[in-house]
Amino acid sequence: MAAAMAAVIALPAAAQEQDLTVLPPAQNGYQPKTTEWGEPDFRGGWPIDHLNGRTPLQRDPQYGNRIFLTDEEFAERADMVAELAKRYENEDSSGTMGIGHWAEVAAANRRTSWIVSPANGRLPGFTAEGKRLADAMRSTWRRNQPWDWTTDFDSWDRCITRGLPASMFPVMYNNGMRIFQAPGLVAIQMEMVHETRLIPTDGSPPLPRQIDMWLGESRGHWEDGNTLVVETTNFKPGPSITNIGTTGSPPENDTPLSPQAKLVERFTMTGPDSIVYDMTWTDPVVFTAPWSARLDWVRDDEFEIFEYACHEGNEQIRNYINTTRHDRAQARESSQ
C-alpha cells in the first residue's frame, strides 16, 4: 500500500521536471486480472481520503495554467498540511479530541487543482440560462436566504444525495468508495450519504430520457482490458453538481444542471493498487464549455464503510424552518 501511495505522489514530481502545465496521460499498459466471467476485475476498496490534502477543485488564479506546484510551493503546502495534522495530534494525545476524527487530513499533493480543463483549472462561465438557474437554487449554504419550507434546502441538506459529479470528489470526511461487480454490472458504493451507483455493462439500452434520477442513468463498457468507460445522462435537477465540502468549490452549493447534462468517466487501472479517474462534464445549457478533472485512486481493501446515519426528516431541517418563522414573527412585532 505504501508503495502504491508513493507512486501516486511521485508521478507529479516527475512531470514537474518537464512542464508544469502538462498532465501526463494515464498509463494504460497494465492488464488487471479478470473476474470469473471474464471482465477486468476492479473489485475492492478505493477510498479517496488520501486526496484530501488541500488540493482544491478549482485552481487559484496565481498558478495560471500550471497543473503542478513547484518544489517551493509544494513545500509550503506540505508545511500547512503538517501543521493541521499536528493540531489533531495535540488534541488526540491530550484526550480532548472529542469527535475530531470524523475529519482527517491527508498528505499534501502537488496538483494545483483537480480540474484540468479548461487550462486555467477553473469551472467555465455560466450561460445566461445557467446564471438564472443558479440564482434560483436554494441551500443552507446560500447567504441571506430564509428557510420557509423543505424546498429551500438542497438534496445534501436533506441527506438525500450529493449528486454527480460532486459525489466523486473528496471532502473532509466519509470518502469511502468500494467497487462491486457482477456479470454485466458494476456497482460503486459511496460512503457519503450511503449511495450506490449501478452501472450496467451488458450493452442493454438506456432508459427513456424522460426518466430522471438523482445520480442519473449510467451505461458502461470496457476498453483496452483495463478501462471502464461510463456515460451518464438523465439527471434529476436539484443537487448542485459541485459541493462546498470539496475544497475550492463554489461556496454556496449553487452550480445547477439541465436536462442536457452528460457525464463521461474513465476508470483506468494503471497497476494492481491504482486507478486513474478522469471525468468530463458537458452541459451547454448551463456552461459555456465542458470541463474535465482527474483524480488518482489508491486501493485500500481494509477501509471500512460504516453507517451514514444522516437521514431526511431529522431535527436540522425543522430547526432551520422554525428559526426563520421566529425571526419573521419578531420582525412583525418590532414593526408594529
Predicted regions mapped to residue ranges:
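Bacterial N-terminal signal peptides
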Residues: 1-10
